[in-house]
C-alpha cells in the first residue's frame, strides 16, 4: 500500500500550484510547481510547505 501525503498551496498568478509529496515508505520528498493537482491534498501556504519539507529532511528524508 502506498503511504504518501500530498500538500499544495493556492494557485499562483500563472495557474500553477506549489506542491509536495512525502513518500513515507521510501523516505523521499518531491516538491515543485505543477499545473495539475495530485489527489487527496492538504492545502497550506507555500512557506508552511517549505518548513514542513525541511523538517522531513532533518528526519532523514531525501529531496528529489
How should these model regions be labeled?
Residues 1-2, 58-64:
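Short intrinsically disordered terminal tails
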Residues 5, 9-55:
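Acidic, low-complexity, intrinsically disordered interaction modules
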Amino acid at each position: 500500500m502506498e503511504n504518501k501525503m500530498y500538500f499544495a498551496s493556492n494557485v499562483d498568478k500563472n495557474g500553477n500550484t506549489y506542491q509536495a509529496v512525502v513518500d513515507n515508505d521510501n523516505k523521499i520528498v518531491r516538491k515543485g510547481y505543477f499545473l495539475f493537482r495530485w489527489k487527496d491534498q492538504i492545502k497550506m501556504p507555500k512557506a508552511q510547505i517549505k518548513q514542513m519539507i525541511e523538517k522531513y529532511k532533518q528526519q532523514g528524508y531525501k529531496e528529489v
